[in-house]
Amino acid sequence: MARKSLCVKAQRTPKFKVRTYNRCPLCGRPRGYMRKFGICRICFRNMASEGLLPGVIKSSW
């Protein structure tokens, strides 16, 4: 419940612009957010391994 309320709170426009922070829309995680994809690293990894993100491939060297 706390995570859900924090997600709703993050969607509101704050009094000052610097107070905005990014949250994953899928799981609500505030840390490990990837701006390019708009999701957290854990959701990114799951979606990439399922093939849901076009153009993303697993690297190997």
From Swiss-Prot:
One of its GO terms (biological process) is translation. It holds the Pfam family Ribosomal_S14. The keyword Zinc applies. Binds 1 zinc ion per subunit. Keywords: Metal-binding, Ribonucleoprotein, Ribosomal protein, RNA-binding, rRNA-binding, Zinc. The keyword Acetylation does not apply. Its cofactor is Zn(2+). Zn(2+) binds at C24, C27, C40, C43. One of its GO terms (cellular component) is small ribosomal subunit. GO terms for molecular function: rRNA binding; structural constituent of ribosome; zinc ion binding. InterPro entries: Ribosomal_uS14, Ribosomal_uS14_bact, Ribosomal_uS14_CS, Ribosomal_uS14_sf. Part of the 30S ribosomal subunit. Contacts proteins S3 and S10. Binds 16S rRNA, required for the assembly of 30S particles and may also be responsible for determining the conformation of the 16S rRNA at the A site. This is Small ribosomal subunit protein uS14. It comes from Desulfatibacillum aliphaticivorans. The gene is rpsZ.
